[in-house]
Every structure is written in structure tokens, then in C-alpha cells.
Amino acid sequence: MKFTELTVTEFDNFVQNPSLESHYFQVKENIVTRENDGFEVVLLGIKDDNNKVIAASLFSKIPTMGSYVYYSNRGPVMDFSDLGLVDYYLKELDKYLQQHQCLYVKLDPYWLYHLYDKDIVPFEGREKNDALVNLFKSHGYEHHGFTTEYDTSSQVRWMGVLNLEGKTPETLKKTFDSQRKRNINKAINYGVKVRFLESDEFNLFLDLYRETEERAGFVSKTDDYFYNFIDTYGDKVLVPLAYIDLDEYVLKLQQELNDKENRRDQMMAKENKSDKQMKKIAELDKQIDHDQHELLNASELSKTDGPILNLASGVYFANAYEVNYFSGGSSEKYNQFMGPYMMHWFMINYCFDNGYDRYNFYGLSGDFTENSEDYGVYRFKRGFNVQIEELIGDFYKPIHKVKYWLFTTLDKLRKKLKK
């Protein structure tokens, strides 16, 4: 085996293997996004004795104190169950960094530490991956810890994932809780549609994202941050928009209303109606009243807000391994149409149609108590019967130790001065 720099083609060919647990940051398209952010990129990996790539990682080189911080965001990509391979990678990476002006290195691999069901019950027969964590420590890495909160300096360590392998949309939907099934069916009955936005329509996503940001008060990303991905990731970034055409909905409602009124009139025309028939008529009367009310509201909404209402939108990344929900927004004013549910259901079906076995709802804090900052987010994802995946976390290692000590000391002083 040999540790070496890789070409873009070598890197790309390797990470296209769907059996490898790889992240959308470890794709060739991310080279340009990192360069757009002002960082150099280097591709490092391992080749076996037949010159075949068996490990790969995309590193950003972040200029710091006359040296570089080497950061492989969600790397490296390899068979991490092969501890011998991981050991060799870490040993040879250290040698490389010693020769290439590295201040310190940060790795946050997309590697599983433990696996749980939706209720945070560990999967039977699964063990915590302490061997991997201990291997990193044996190479001088500091583990950032088994965190259970969001940290703006780190990628998420907990995720909610739908495993689609061996399932169909129908069998999967049966595993959802009653609220998820009911709301998806509501959206379908409303006639909510989903389409992918073109790059020049991305402002429609941003409008919904900014509305949600203001409503929820979360830390948002800039427009430029999103456009960096939109402009470079090509077909690896997907932006669905859930919307409703009120003209079509009104027409559908009118047809249903006409049908119910005709059935009611036919039943009323019969003589000597039984109690059972009278109950059916009473039920139809309720449905007719409801439909008339809905028809009036939809007609008024179309007049004031226009016939097309944008309900929800999201940014997704698709790589060889999975489809990953990155960020989203929705309109609170139109929440009765269940736009977010239809968007997720559409994208889940997209996975089935395109051969993906994983639909990743992505980030959770890891605190699953009712008082946690994202308990509502957890409940939403839990309702889809996700499996909870815990990743091994962040690892740091100083390479230039004297300069690293100076760097951390100055950083502590800066933080004290800010208080």
C-alpha cells in the first residue's frame, strides 16, 4: 500500500462507490466550492499494491499563522471496519502533514459510532464503535467528545435516516405514525404538487427559508453560501418546491361538491327513508357544508394571494450513497396544505425511483429529552420511523506543536477579551 495525492478523476471514481458511507462534502464538486471560499484543496488517499484506490479524502487547507489547518470535512472515505487500513491511513497522513506546513489537522468522519431505533433503543447485536475512537486517540488525536448539542464549529453528530432497502413506498408509509400518514394524505387530497426549481428560480427557496428563519429564530446561512453550492454541484443538488394551484383545487372541490349534492338529492327523493339512510343524508350535509366553506376560502385566497401558492422548499444533496436533506423553509400562512409533508414524501419517492437506499433527514442534537432545543424536530423525524445514527465525532491533532500551543493560547486570550 502507499499513501499518495490523488487526481480528481481517481478521487471521483472511488467515492462513486455506493457501498461506501460517503458524504456530499466528499465529492469532486466540493473542490470548487472550497476554492470559491478562498481555500486550497488537496486530495489524499491510499492505493493498494495493484494501484487501486482504497481510501480517499478531500482536504481544505486553511491558512493559519503562516501554516495550514488541514480539514477533511466528513472524510476520509474508506471501509472503516478495516481497522488496519484506518491505522495505516492515520500513520501515513501524519507523515504527509509533517512535510506540508500543517499546524493541526481536523477530521470528522462520516462513520457510525452507534445505531438506534426511533425511540433511541440500540439496535440488537450492534456494539458501540469504541475501537475506532481509541484508534484515533492512539495516533495522538483529541476527541471532541460524544456531544449532545448543536455546535456551530462542528458538523452534526446525530442523524435521522430512513433505510429504504427492501421496502416500497407503500410498505414504508405503513411504518409512519398516524399523524405523518394523515398529513401526507391531506396534502395529496389538496392536490399539492412538487417540482424541482431551476437555478434561476432559487430565490423561491430563499423566500421560504428566510420566512422560516425569522419565525424560528435559527442561525441562518447567507444567500452566497447557498449559491456557492447551487452554482457548482450541478445535478448533485436538488431543490424541490411544494406548491398548490388553487384554480385546480377549486375545480376539484366544485366537482366533488356537485357529486355530493347530486347523491344527497337522489337520497332525499326516496320515500320512506330508513334511519340508516337519514344518517347518510346527515353525513352528506356535513360534507357539503365543509366543501362549500373550503370552496369559498380557496376562491378568496386565490383572489388575494394569486392562484399559485408556494408552500415549502428544501435543498437536498445526492451522492452515490444517499439523498440528504440539507435545509428547508415553509410558509406558516399556508400550513393547512401540508407542504413540507408533501415535499418529503415526493423526495422519498424520488429515492425509490432512482435506486437510493437511504433518505437522510439529517441533523439532530442528540438530546432527545422534551426540554431539548430541537425536540420538535426530533418528534417530526421520529414520526417517519427513522433510525437514529450516531457518528463518531470530531478529532483534532496538532502537527506543529509549538506553534499550535501559541495558537490555542492566543485563541483563549481573544475569547476572554470578548467577554
From Swiss-Prot:
GO cellular component terms given for this protein: cytoplasm
Annotated InterPro entries: Acyl_CoA_acyltransferase, FEMABX, PG_Glycine_Bridge_Synth
Gene Ontology molecular function terms on file: aminoacyltransferase activity
SUPFAM superfamilies according to UniProt: Acyl-CoA N-acyltransferases (Nat)
GO biological process: one example: regulation of cell shape
Pfam families membership: FemAB (PF02388)
Main location: cytoplasm
Reaction(s) catalysed by this chain's protein: MurNAc-L-Ala-D-isoglutaminyl-L-Lys-(N(6)-tri-Gly)-D-Ala-D-Ala-diphospho-di-trans,octa-cis-undecaprenyl-GlcNAc + 2 glycyl-tRNA(Gly) = MurNAc-L-Ala-D-isoglutaminyl-L-Lys-(N(6)-penta-Gly)-D-Ala-D-Ala-diphospho-di-trans,octa-cis-undecaprenyl-GlcNAc + 2 tRNA(Gly) + 2 H(+)
Residues spanning the membrane: none
EC number: 2.3.2.18
Location of the protein in the cell: Cytoplasm
Keyword ATP-binding included in the entry's annotation: no
UniProt keyword annotations, A-Z: Acyltransferase, Antibiotic resistance, Cell shape, Cell wall biogenesis/degradation, Cytoplasm, Peptidoglycan synthesis, Transferase
PANTHER family the UniProt entry points to: AMINOACYLTRANSFERASE FEMA (PTHR36174:SF2), LIPID II:GLYCINE GLYCYLTRANSFERASE (PTHR36174)
Binding partners and assembly: Homodimer. Interacts with FemA.
Protein's name in the database: Aminoacyltransferase FemB
Species, as recorded: Staphylococcus aureus (strain MW2)
